[in-house]
Every structure is written in C-alpha cells, then in structure tokens.
C-alpha cells in the first residue's frame, strides 16, 4: 500500500522537477493542488477521501517517484541488540537523554544506539544503497515476491545488529575506537563515519567495493582513484568516493545550493550524509527546488536479526514489534499513543469504514528497512557533510569527471586533478601563504593520525564557502526567502581543526528564511511530508 500523509504546511510545488540520485521526475499538477496550498486538515481529508474511493496512490507525487524512494534502504535506531561494551570514558547519561526517552539502562553495555548512533545509521544507509546499486543496478525497484529480493536480503544481512556481520553497528563502533579515538556511545561525525566505511569495506572483500575518502577540501586525485580501482589487475573494481566537506560555518551557504543539487542529480550519486543544523543526522537522497528529500534514522525499532531460515528479519516486522521497541523509550511510546488517538478521532469524524481503519493500522506499522522520506529546506542543513558517489567502471569514472561541476566550472565543491601535490611543494605553499589574513589550523596527514585529526570530528573539513565569498558570486532567488529582511551574516571562522589552511577574506552574506517560511517540523522546522508505502 502507498501512503502520502501531509503533516506540513509548506507550499505545494508543481513547478520544479524532482531529482532522486540521478533520476528525474515530473511533478503532478492537479486541479485540487494547482495554484494553492493545503492546510493540515485539507491534506488529511484528501488522504481519507482517496482511501474511501479505493485510490491509495499519492495525488501529489508520481508513482514512479514513490516506488523509487521506497526502494531505498533505510537504517535507523535499534533496540535490543547484543551489548556494545561501555568504556570507562563513555558518555554518561544526561537529563536530556532521559527526557527524550533515550536512556539505556543496561550497565554492561549499550543495547540501543538511540541518541548517539544517528550518524552511524545514515552512513550505513548511504553504504547500503551504494551496495544495492552495485549489485542490483540503479533501476531496480523493490517489489513483493521479486526473485531479486534474495540479493536485496543478502545486502541487508550485512547490516544485521550483531558483531559477526561486516557492517553492523558493533563494527562501526569498533572502527571508531580503532581509527578515530571514539568511545562507545559517542556521536560520530562525517569523518569518523567515512573512515569506518573505508576500513570495513577493505576488511570485507565480498562486498565488491573499495572506498576512496577525501577530507581535504573535496579534492580527488585521478591517479589515486585509478590505483585503488585497478590495483595489480586489469579489472576496474567499483569505487565508493566519499568527500568530507564543509559549506559554511553555522549553516549551508545558499549561494552554492545549486552545487549540492548538482551532486544529487548525477547518476553516480548515492546520497549526502549530514545533519539538520547541529543535532539530527539525515541522509539526503534527492531534491525539489530548494527542498531536500531525507531519510531520517531517529525512529527506534527492534534490532535487525535473522529468521528461522537465515533470512534477515526486516520487512515482516509488525506494529506490535515496533511498539515493543518504542516501549523501551517512554516518550516515543507516548507519542505513538497520541498519534493513534488523533487518527482515530479524525477517522470517526469522517465516518470511515472498518476497512479504512484496518488500512490505517497498516499505515502505523512502518516497514523496518524501507521508509518514508521527509522534506527539509536547504538552509536548515548543517554545513558539515559527507557526499557519496559510486563509480562502477572506467567509463563511469570519466563520465563523472566530465559532469561534476559542469554547470559552472568556475565554482566547484569537488576538484579533480591528475596527481597530488608533493609534500615539499605543499609545505612551501603553506608557509608562503602565512599572514594575518589566514586562519591557521592543525594539519594532519596519513591514516595513522586519525585520532588527532578528529578531536572535533564534525569540524575537521575545510570550509569551501570561503572560496565563493572571495569571488563575489551573486545569490540566486530562493522560494520562500525574503531577501529584503535577511540580515544574518556568516561570522569569521572560530578556532577548529581543518585539514589545511583557509584564506578568510570577508564575511559572507547568507539569506535567511523567515519564521513563517512554511516549513514545520517533526521537532523544530522539519516538515512532515511523508512518502512511502
């Protein structure tokens, strides 16, 4: 069954095309939505009327778009997995965690990652979808009883929440300890997550994927990629390119929103792992206009396990199973009860039938590895992010190099050069640039010093927005942005570690959305537009 629950009030967009990881979809224009916005009650009533009429399809998004986003693998908080041993220096419980229902009472170890594993889960999702594209192709769509589901299930099994599986949260945490000096229960940033992905893929060759990670200003070196892809053979091994970048100080610079959209529109894209301004990790898989489509890893569910015949248990989990997981977190359980009461009251007022009530019970039973997407305005995205691209062949690599930054060659966030500058030349350039106009930060090279480089993990990337401030790139008009009332300025860089020096020339002007920009939040300002099955 398909669902479209409008829980937000942002403008309906029937003008801009929809992009999802290299695919493009036309918006649906209907008489009901064209030229006007629907409030919450109107959207909810539209869903009820659609169900009573026997039509369970979205009236705002195309069926092909819904099928595409639903086919993306979604990994979220889990509860009840084998304990991850605590460290004596692991984060202690806080009042905030208790109020949010994220209190793990197991004194031996963590049996849930709620509250600290969101970046790990978004990184797992990025990797899982890269593997899905690699082994099943970008055009594959999830269907019940499809023979290809066997391969799909095999990929899911690699992420089951037990230490024996190669990409489990247990092994991500171990990599954090090993290469990033992260303690169990400590939040990962994009850099720590990408290093974990790189090492875990290297330790598990059956995945068929090698990882190229660049944390220095989005630079990619042609010779390094080819050496990694070919090794000692004549066969090109698929490469997952991970680029750690920072596009502003406190928020994404809207001047370069077009470049982020360009990344997501490339056929090699597997998503952008980042955060909603400072606290909530998200995986962006597409966009429409100035709004990004996200997968959210913050709904606790029962731990992924194996069934009687060795298959990963995920799609067949029931509403009761989900409630058992949520029951360990009082606040989540409370909100589930509130949602039930609200839905039942609305449906009784609409004189719905028993079949409609049954349908809504199914709606409440969220799938475990395929989920709805959420819309978020670009300006609410944290500037520190991890961009992923899957390169499957020599031709694919050449195509990616040709198209990345093609729209505006003079302004790029990904820079591809033939070879890396030698260390002596780099040191000469570094020393010759020193002056009062340069923000000088610790520089760390080599994988052995990861722990030193990631003391402040979310801030260890070069701020590329400074490049655009220097060139005086004019801001473009954004839907819902009142340019005349915008007054926020990006401040000079605070003291933080970057991978190389950054020239600071002047402050950067960033348009700011007004309070009533139409984006409401599940928590703050995140819209609740949801699309899925």
UniProtKB/Swiss-Prot annotation:
One annotated GO biological process: mitophagy
One GO cellular component term, please give it.
nucleus
Chief subcellular location equals cytoplasm
Assigned EC number: 3.4.22.-
Q: Which reaction does it catalyse?
A: [protein]-C-terminal L-amino acid-glycyl-phosphatidylethanolamide + H2O = [protein]-C-terminal L-amino acid-glycine + a 1,2-diacyl-sn-glycero-3-phosphoethanolamine
Keyword Hydrolase applies: yes
Q: Which residues are named in the active-site annotation? A: 118 (nucleophile)
- Leader sequence range is none
| Subcellular locations according to the entry | Cytoplasm; Nucleus; Preautophagosomal structure
Q: Which domain of life is it from?
A: Eukaryota
This molecule's function is given as:
Cysteine protease that plays a key role in cytoplasm to vacuole transport (Cvt) and autophagy by mediating both proteolytic activation and delipidation of ATG8. Required for selective autophagic degradation of the nucleus (nucleophagy) as well as for mitophagy which contributes to regulate mitochondrial quantity and quality by eliminating the mitochondria to a basal level to fulfill cellular energy requirements and preventing excess ROS production. The protease activity is required for proteolytic activation of ATG8: cleaves the C-terminal amino acid of ATG8 to reveal a C-terminal glycine.
What is the protein name stated in its UniProt record? Probable cysteine protease ATG4
């Amino acid at each position: 069954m398909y669902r479209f629950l409008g829980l937000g009030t942002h403008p309906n967009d029937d003008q801009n095309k929809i992009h999802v990881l290299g695919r493009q979809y036309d918006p649906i224009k209907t008489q009901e939505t064209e030229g006007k916005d629907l409030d919450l009650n109107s959207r909810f009533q539209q869903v009820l009327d659609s169900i009573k009429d026997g039509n369970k399809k979205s009236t705002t998004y195309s069926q092909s778009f819904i099928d595409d986003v639903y086919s993306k693998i979604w990994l979220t908080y889990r509860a009840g997995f084998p304990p991850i041993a605590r460290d004596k220096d692991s984060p202690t419980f806080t009042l905030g965690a208790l109020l949010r229902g994220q209190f793990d009472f197991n004194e031996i170890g963590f049996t849930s990652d709620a509250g600290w594993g969101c970046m790990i889960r978004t990184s797992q999702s990025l990797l899982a979808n890269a593997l899905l594209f690699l082994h099943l192709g970008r055009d594959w769509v999830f269907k019940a009883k499809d023979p290809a589901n066997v391969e799909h299930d095999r990929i899911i099994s690699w992420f089951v929440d037990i230490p024996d599986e190669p990409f489990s949260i247990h092994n991500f945490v171990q990599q954090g300890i090993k290469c990033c000096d992260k303690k169990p229960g400590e939040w990962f940033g994009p850099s720590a997550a990408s290093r974990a992905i790189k090492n875990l893929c290297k330790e598990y060759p059956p995945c068929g994927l090698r990882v190229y990670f660049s944390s220095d200003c989005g630079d990619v070196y042609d010779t390094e990629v080819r050496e990694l892809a070919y090794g000692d053979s004549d066969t090109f091994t698929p490469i997952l390119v991970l680029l750690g970048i920072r596009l502003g100080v406190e928020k994404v610079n809207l001047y370069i929103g077009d470049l982020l959209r360009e990344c997501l529109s490339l056929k090699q894209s597997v998503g952008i792992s980042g955060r909603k301004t400072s606290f909530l990790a998200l995986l962006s898989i597409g966009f429409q206009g100035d709004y990004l489509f996200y997968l959210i890893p913050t709904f606790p569910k029962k731990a992924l396990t194996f069934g009687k015949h060795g298959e990963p248990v995920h799609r067949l989990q029931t509403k009761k199973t989900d409630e058992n997981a949520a029951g360990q977190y009082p606040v989540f359980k409370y909100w589930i009860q509130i949602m039930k009461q609200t839905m039942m009251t609305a449906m009784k007022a609409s004189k719905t039938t028993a079949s409609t009530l049954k349908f809504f019970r199914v709606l409440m039973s969220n799938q475990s590895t395929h989920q709805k997407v959420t819309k978020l305005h670009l300006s609410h995205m944290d500037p520190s992010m991890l961009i992923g691209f899957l390169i499957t062949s020599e031709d694919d690599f050449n195509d990616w190099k040709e198209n990345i930054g093609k729209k505006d060659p003079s302004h790029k966030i990904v820079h591809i050069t033939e070879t890396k500058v030698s260390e002596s030349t780099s040191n000469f350039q570094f020393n010759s640039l020193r002056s009062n106009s340069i923000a000088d930060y610790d520089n760390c090279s080599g994988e052995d010093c990861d722990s030193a480089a990631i003391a402040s993990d979310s801030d260890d990337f070069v701020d590329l927005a400074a490049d655009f401030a220097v060139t005086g790139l004019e801001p473009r008009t954004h839907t819902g942005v009142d340019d005349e009332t915008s007054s926020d300025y990006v401040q000079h860089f605070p003291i933080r570690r970057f991978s190389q020096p950054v020239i600071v020339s002047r402050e950067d002007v960033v348009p700011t959305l007004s309070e009533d920009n139409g984006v409401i939040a599940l928590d703050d300002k995140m819209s609740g537009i949801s699309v899925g099955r």
